[in-house]
Amino acid sequence: MIRACLLAAAIVLPAAAEPGGLDVVVGNVRSAKGNVRVAVCDKATFLQETCAYRGHAPARPGEVIVHIAGVPPGAYAAQAFHDENGNGKIDRTFFGIPREGIGFSNDAQMRFGPPSFADAMFSVGAGGGRIAFALRYFQ
């Protein structure tokens, strides 16, 4: 009986005690093509390929929720894009304008380039959290 209880606790507790889970609600997704990809970055890795926390979910019109596991407490900025063609990168025009929907936490605006970390920054507490922002399509 004790062995069964210990086994059950070993299975249930890790799932229930996931520290720092972050739900990212990405709005204004225009179609069900491809995936919505999210990166949650600290200041040193913002806008870099080296963001430690990433996730994706199948696209659907409206809102898509992407769960990012294991984000420790701290200051972060999130970026998301609608990878409509499934190539894993943001496609751009000759002038560098994104061809696919793109967005940043706090709905930070892109003005002749990406926003600053300070404009997109949010905090994650010990219990994780939930943030929401919308994609913008330039084409």
Task: Go through each PLM region and give its residues.
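A short, amphipathic beta-strand motif
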Residues: L22-V29, V38, F133
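Extracellular beta-sheet/turn segments enriched in Thr/Pro/Gly and aliphatic residues
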Residues: E100-F138
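Exposed aromatic-hydrophobic patches
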Residues: V64-G70, F133
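Hydrophobic h-region of N-terminal signal peptides that target proteins for export
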Residues: A8-A17
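Surface-exposed loops/turns
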Residues: R60, P72-P73
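Acidic, glycine-anchored loop motifs typical of Ca2+
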Residues: E84-R92
